[in-house]
Amino acid sequence: MVFVKLPLLKALSVPMDRGRRLSDGQRVFGANKTWKGFLGMILFCAVSAWLCWRRAFTFSFLRGAWLGFAYAIAELPNSFIKRRLNIVPGKNGGIVQTFFDQADSVIGYVLLLPIVYPLTPAEASGIFIIGTATHYIVNVLLYFMKLKKQKG
């Protein structure tokens, strides 16, 4: 989120759907899903993985990039559904939608993580619970830092 707010790589700050609307008149993903955020998450995860694992650069960097891709791509279906439900980008549509706003990317991460790291069901459940809770807590902190407009 901080990266997206910085005045860097402005050419990537365009919405992924480029303003395209479907037959229902709504945007595909909305203004908040930008190439800068999508690619930034992949790069952030790749660099973080390399810094944490300190194995061969290519191994760690590519593994992190894969997991960043999983995280970023999993946010898109939720954004698509929210547009169909006329929920404004950056807003939630009730408790169920708030849950999916926090859990969508974690679900993608847990589904694609086994490709690079085998998981037991208990590990997958733990990652899901801790990841979703962490996502919510970080969003609340971003709200108090005035980097997000709503808490959840």
Regions found by a protein language model. Name each.
Residues 1-49, 53-68, 72-111, 121-152:
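Interhelical loop and helix-boundary elements at the membrane-water interface
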Residues 115-116:
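Selective transmembrane helix interface/packing segments
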